[in-house]
Amino acid sequence: MYPEELCMPMREDLTSVGFVEMRDPEDVAEILDKKEGTVLVMVNSVCGCAAANARPAAKISTNHSKRPDVFATVFAGQDIGATAKAREYMHPYPPSSPSIALFKDGNLVHFIERHHIEGRPAEMIAENLIQAFNSYC
């Protein structure tokens, strides 16, 4: 685990635009067990592709007119229990951080894995999310 003071700005990068932090398994269950509505979950990370690509893309997507009911985040490598619980909902995809998942009515409907984030500009990833929002939100 990294020191919390190192991770705080990475957390705030998302919470400052309305993402709800899920810090423990109970937080995850409270949000993802709901069977109505849409939820975007960003699996945050300290890696460079989270900073350069995933978080900026997630932030850009919050400005779209058609959007999920809830934007939420877990922090891989920091909030171990919450991340493990969130990943239970992301099957059949293997653990991936960063990653971005969209749920509708309790079902996983769209997933962006790390290998779809690395090397792609934030705008391209955001467009992928926006297309998913247009389809599911």
Residue ranges and their predicted role:
Residues 83-97:
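Short acidic (Asp/Glu) patches
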Residues 45, 50-58, 70, 82, ...:
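Amphipathic alpha-helical interface surfaces
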Residues 1-36, 133-137:
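N-terminal leader/targeting and pre-domain segments
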Residues 30-65:
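Local sequence-structure signature of Cys/Sec-based thiol-disulfide redox active-site neighborhoods
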Residues 94-137:
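Non-catalytic, surface beta->alpha helical segment in thiol-disulfide oxidoreductase systems
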Residues 22, 43, 66-84:
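Thiol-based oxidoreductase modules, predominantly thioredoxin-like and allied folds used
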